[in-house]
Amino acid sequence: MLLVVGLGNPGKEYAAHRHNVGFMAIDALADEVRADPFREKFSGVHARAEIAGQQAILLKPMTYMNESGRSVQPAMAFFKVAPSELIVLHDELDLPFGTVRLKVGGGHAGHNGLRSIISHGGTGNFGRVRLGVGRPPAGFRGEVADYVLSGFDAVERASLPDCLKQAVQSVLEVAARGFEAAMNVRNTRPKPGKRQKGEGDGSTDPAPAAKEGKGPLPPTQKP
């Protein structure tokens, strides 16, 4: 069984924020695979589905981002899901907007939703679908948290459906072929000299403020 988790913050006031692109992606996935209606449990809402012939649970934690692990870990225990069967969809500052990349394992790179899941589960050895939202543009007034807790601009909104479609297709590919094969298909690298920081296999060093255990906690000091 697969447990596919989309990260975000509950409430209408957060629904269109960059930080909620994981929620958006899990909703798009639910539509694509015709999942059952979402029901409340595990401090979140979950739905049953079949993806590429596998039974799956789609989960949206309703704990606010910083406490996502309080929802994910009980769901894993209840459904007897191993870390290798967990897929987390989340926003990624270190990828340009519209870029979707797969990754297995690693740390949280300053993402407080991942931080909570790793803390509660005791391991980071699970799959991630990273949806790029980019870093704040030059001249942005505010902290990184203010940026991810703000809406997409008009150009981004026009491209967002394609980004969500990429995320959905990535999950379908993982379910059908496994992470390694899916990464070979989905993590297409740019031409030499065109590589963006953070692209590829997710192994690039995060920005200084986002390194584990150093600097202020980025994206989600606010809910």
From Swiss-Prot:
What the entry lists under Gene3D superfamilies is as follows: Peptidyl-tRNA hydrolase
Protein location: Cytoplasm
Query: What are the residue positions of the site described as Discriminates between blocked and unblocked aminoacyl-tRNA?
Result: 9
Positions of the record's site feature: Stabilizes the basic form of H active site to accept a proton:
91
- Per the record, what is one GO cellular component? cytoplasm
Q: Which InterPro entries does the UniProt record give?
A: Pept_tRNA_hydro, Pept_tRNA_hydro_CS, Pept_tRNA_hydro_sf
* GO terms under biological process: protein quality control for misfolded or incompletely synthesized proteins; rescue of stalled ribosome
Keyword vocabulary terms for this entry: Cytoplasm, Hydrolase, RNA-binding, tRNA-binding
Decide whether keyword RNA-binding is in the record.
Answer: yes
In this chain, tRNA is annotated as bound at 14, 64, 66, 112
Q: List the disulfide bonds.
A: none
GO molecular function annotations of the record = peptidyl-tRNA hydrolase activity; tRNA binding
Which Enzyme Commission number(s) are listed? Answer: 3.1.1.29
Catalytic reaction annotation: an N-acyl-L-alpha-aminoacyl-tRNA + H2O = an N-acyl-L-amino acid + a tRNA + H(+)
Q: Which PROSITE patterns match?
A: PEPT_TRNA_HYDROL_2
Q: Which residues form a coiled coil?
A: none
Q: Tell me, what does this protein do in biology?
A: Hydrolyzes ribosome-free peptidyl-tRNAs (with 1 or more amino acids incorporated), which drop off the ribosome during protein synthesis, or as a result of ribosome stalling.
Can you tell me which family this protein belongs to?
Belongs to the PTH family.
Subunit text: Monomer.
Spell out the protein name for this chain.
Answer: Peptidyl-tRNA hydrolase
- Source species of the chain: Sorangium cellulosum (strain So ce56) (Polyangium cellulosum (strain So ce56))
What's the gene?
pth
